[in-house]
């Protein structure tokens, strides 16, 4: 996937299937968008759309060290950073940044590594805030037939009658209470 794309030249042709699944809804008067690592870029379009719809957007971004997309997020959001090494913003995680800055929201949207998503899911449950998370898995078929991208769910699905959700078809965005991560 990504490696093949990186070797492409202008004019090269590809076949692609997509987009797959669903995306984030653009709701909330005071939404918080949270991105960690490679989960940061997917949140930029959402932050811009939310701002355009009149929302007061807060972005909490988690990095190892080097910051990116700061100006782009700043044009649509109040931006708070967390870095593992303390290079900028809060030293620690996005959860640390949320607590340190006493941030609140009426809805949370998040994309990033699973440990971060687990912590955000827990925080949202404690604060009783709806939370939508974007999960990532390799998607072999992209249409939900192969079940390679399933995650555990609270309810049985109609497709296989087990507690699974297909990330490519039922997601990748889920209400955090629907899935186990």
Annotate each language-model stretch with its function:
Residues 10, 25, 29, 45, ...:
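Short capping/connector residues at structural and topological boundaries
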Residues 22-79:
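Hydrophobic, well-structured mid-protein blocks that either form specific transmembrane helices
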């Amino acid at each position: 996937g990504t490696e093949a794309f990186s070797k492409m030249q202008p004019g090269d042709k590809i076949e692609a299937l997509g987009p797959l699944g669903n995306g984030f809804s653009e709701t909330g008067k005071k939404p918080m968008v949270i991105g960690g690592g490679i989960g940061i870029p997917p949140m930029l379009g959402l932050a811009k759309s939310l701002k355009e719809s009149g929302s007061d957007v807060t972005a909490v971004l988690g990095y190892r060290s080097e910051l990116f997309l700061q100006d782009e997020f700043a044009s649509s959001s109040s931006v708070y950073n967390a870095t593992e090494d303390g290079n900028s913003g809060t030293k620690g995680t996005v959860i640390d940044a949320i607590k340190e800055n006493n941030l609140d929201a009426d809805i949370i949207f998040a994309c990033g590594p699973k440990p971060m998503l687990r912590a955000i899911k827990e925080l949202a449950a404690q604060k009783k805030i709806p939370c939508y998370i974007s999960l990532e898995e390799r998607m072999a078929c992209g249409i939900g037939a192969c079940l390679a991208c399933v995650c555990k769910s609270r309810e049985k699905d109609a497709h296989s009658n087990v507690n699974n959700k297909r990330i490519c078809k039922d997601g990748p965005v889920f209400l955090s209470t629907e899935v186990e991560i």
